[in-house]
């Protein structure tokens, strides 16, 4: 598991208190998340001219809440979290966080949605790639240069009660 895996989520009413939020050590990520949240997505809602949403996860090892902008890829209310890491050789930390704790939050503009992550494979994964490629011309290059099979997680709507029930 990635030793830097540290991302998080808020908890439901009546459950354990939310983990402390630790902003990203990356100035770009930290500033983008702060602008996005302060303006309900009116600012900080793009990266390289492409739309993003804010993914809030729980650190796999630390339990600390982390927030990251990810590309906005959505179909029928389900979001895709594409672990491309801009074509880097490793998966982003949030990917490992979602494997360890699949409940997360997506903020899409002013709307925050509770989601549950599940890795997609085969034909379902290809369908997500087709949608993602149509909106982001960089993904094909990332797949060609990363040297790895880039994972995709479907972020499906979840209810707070799902986590405690």
Predicted regions: what is each one?
Residues 44-45, 71, 96:
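Short secondary-structure boundary/capping segments
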Residues 49-84:
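Short beta-strand segments
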Residues 153-165:
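Charge-rich, low-complexity terminal tails
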